[in-house]
């Protein structure tokens, strides 16, 4: 089983079985998930600020409702104009690879592995006193080339997803305490 933690957690709360962030690239899937905009086949809408600024976003709605809005990604937040999109969507605090040590940034070809960012997020959430907040966490360990410090499954791709599942499971379990 690749995702025992997510499967377990799906039994504990609201679980959407037909909610998809359609795309074959992270930047396009992010816009799909946060703004409800179908991914374009040939270009990332994040690279089109005049268009992406006009899209609705969950973060804007939470901001209007008085929430603090944060985005965590262990990679380069400037890649594909992600930072511009996130700021235009009302995210107040962005945390990315440069907020971590060089050793942590070098833990994955794309940036900071999920075990490190999930531990960082856990510590941040435990210390928060400015709630309510809407925090978006974009994982990266399940990206190609699928190299992670974890060896539960023999095949590389399912193992990378299992690693992310392990990190998310630990994060949620710790937050429940």
Predicted segments, located by residue:
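Solvent-exposed soluble domains appended to multi-pass membrane proteins
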Residues: 1-177
């Amino acid at each position: 089983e690749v995702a025992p933690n997510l499967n377990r957690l799906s039994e504990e709360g609201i679980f959407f079985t037909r909610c998809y962030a359609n795309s074959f690239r992270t930047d396009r899937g992010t816009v799909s998930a946060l703004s409800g905009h179908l991914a374009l086949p040939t270009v990332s809408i994040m690279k089109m600020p005049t268009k992406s600024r006009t899209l609705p976003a969950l973060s804007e709605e939470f901001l209007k409702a008085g929430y603090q809005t944060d985005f965590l990604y262990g990679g380069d937040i400037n890649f594909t104009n992600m930072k511009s999109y996130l700021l235009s969507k009302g995210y107040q605090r962005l945390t990315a690879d440069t907020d971590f040590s060089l050793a942590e940034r070098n833990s994955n070809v794309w940036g900071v592995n999920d075990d490190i960012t999930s531990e960082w997020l856990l510590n941040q959430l435990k210390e928060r006193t400015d709630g309510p907040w809407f925090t978006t966490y974009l994982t990266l360990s399940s990206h190609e080339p699928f190299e992670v410090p974890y060896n539960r499954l023999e095949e590389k791709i399912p193992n990378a997803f299992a690693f992310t599942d392990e990190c998310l499971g630990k994060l949620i379990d710790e937050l429940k305490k």
